[in-house]
Amino acid sequence: MEIKEQVVFQARKASKASRKLSGIATDVKNKALAAIAEKLVQAKDEIIRANNIDMERGREKGLSKALLDRLELNEKRIEGMAEGLKELVKLEDPVGEVIKMWKRPNGLQIGQMRVPLGVIGMIYEARPNVTVDAAGLCLKTGNAVILRGGSEAINSNKILARIIEDTAVAAGLPEGCVQLIQTTDRKAVKVLFNLTEYLDVLIPRGGAGLINRVIAEAKVPVIQTGVGNCHVYVDSEADLDMALDIVFNAKTSRPAVCNAAESLLVHRQVADEFLPELYKLFRENNVELRGCENTRAILPGIKKAVDDDWSREYLDYIMAVKIVDSFDKAVEHINTYGTKHSEAIITENYTRAHRFLQEIDAAAVYVNASTRFTDGGQFGLGAEIGISTQKLHARGPMGLEELTTTKYIIFGQGQIRE
């Protein structure tokens, strides 16, 4: 079967499955999720063997340490994915919830009820955990999903998707509810872009290149997620010990994720005291700094930052540093170069903290905390399918409610419109 025919076949199958899935009871969906979690742990050796093939090929291709970390599956991570599915079971099912109801003077009762989006196309890079997370969230919310992961993770994704679909169907969910695009040929993605007859939404999750391509080329509606050129601004009235801890965590805890900080802005009044301490800590942990001219006057051993550095999502142990003359200059820089993801200020000044919250245009804005908390689980929302950086439909971590839409339900007693 040709690539186009195969993808259309899968999309048609998903559309058919979504109609059945939308009406399936919560307890059946929860039973399926629990069974998938159990099966993942049982099959961990098989999963790790498949992942080892991807890891070896990744090393041969010269993938960075950070990207290899995203690709790797081990026993602990597989158990973590299974636990994530078990947590989904505990969460309330939003499907069928009537979020408001009112009565009109003519006696009509009108309500708004949550319903699944339908068929979701998930396009993502070499992160096999997304295969499990996305499938779990879609099944819980009654959505069928077509998964297209990065070629570097193809063997891992194949085994994970097979386990998920086989177990889900055995537990009573419709065939075709979870499918993986098996080919790594990019032609398959182009086909997905145009399947408005079968797909209700595309969710790209990955770097700027992937997301921009989907936005530019897709005819299917897109929810934009996660390019994270995130900033930390150290204000003139910052607690510098706190700032050091936060900047270090935001950059180094997992540099290859979208909520990691990529740029640091430091107020001129504290730069001489703060930057040498930061440089010492980062040098000890093999983090490269790239600075503006004023930064390099204090830290002459670091690389010069060029214009491109202010807008880059490194996803690596690299950070751009700029000294700013004022709070207003920091806000201007962030709103110019940021990607509307996660931005943080470190300050003890109440007025500036609240101005930062109001003036920064981003999905998550922090005062005295690391950007690394932008995550559905960390926000208490449960698992997430991605972090939306757009303003329509959903913004920020996209959990269960964000994978639903609403429809109006109207109860009458024979009313007709005059």
From Swiss-Prot:
- Gene Ontology BP terms: L-proline biosynthetic process
Catalysed reactions, as listed in the record: L-glutamate 5-semialdehyde + phosphate + NADP(+) = L-glutamyl 5-phosphate + NADPH + H(+)
Q: Which UniProt keywords apply?
A: Amino-acid biosynthesis, Cytoplasm, NADP, Oxidoreductase, Proline biosynthesis
The record lists its disulfide bonds as none
Provide a Gene Ontology MF annotation, just one: glutamate-5-semialdehyde dehydrogenase activity
SUPFAM superfamilies documented for this protein = ALDH-like (SSF53720)
Pfam families in the record: Aldedh
Which top-level group of life is the source organism from? Bacteria
- Record's keyword annotation contains Mitochondrion: no
GO cellular component terms, semicolon-separated: cytoplasm
- Name the EC number(s): 1.2.1.41
Where it sits in the cell: the answer is: Cytoplasm
State which pathway it belongs to.
Answer: Amino-acid biosynthesis; L-proline biosynthesis; L-glutamate 5-semialdehyde from L-glutamate: step 2/2
Kindly give the InterPro entries that the UniProt entry links to this protein.
Ald_DH/histidinol_DH, Ald_DH_C, Ald_DH_N, Aldehyde_DH_dom, G-glutamylP_reductase_CS, Glu-5-SA_DH, GPR_dom
Query: Which family does this protein fall into?
Result: Belongs to the gamma-glutamyl phosphate reductase family.
- Annotated NCBIfam families: PRK00197.1, proA
The free-text function statement in the UniProt record for this protein reads: Catalyzes the NADPH-dependent reduction of L-glutamate 5-phosphate into L-glutamate 5-semialdehyde and phosphate. The product spontaneously undergoes cyclization to form 1-pyrroline-5-carboxylate.
> Protein name, please?
Gamma-glutamyl phosphate reductase
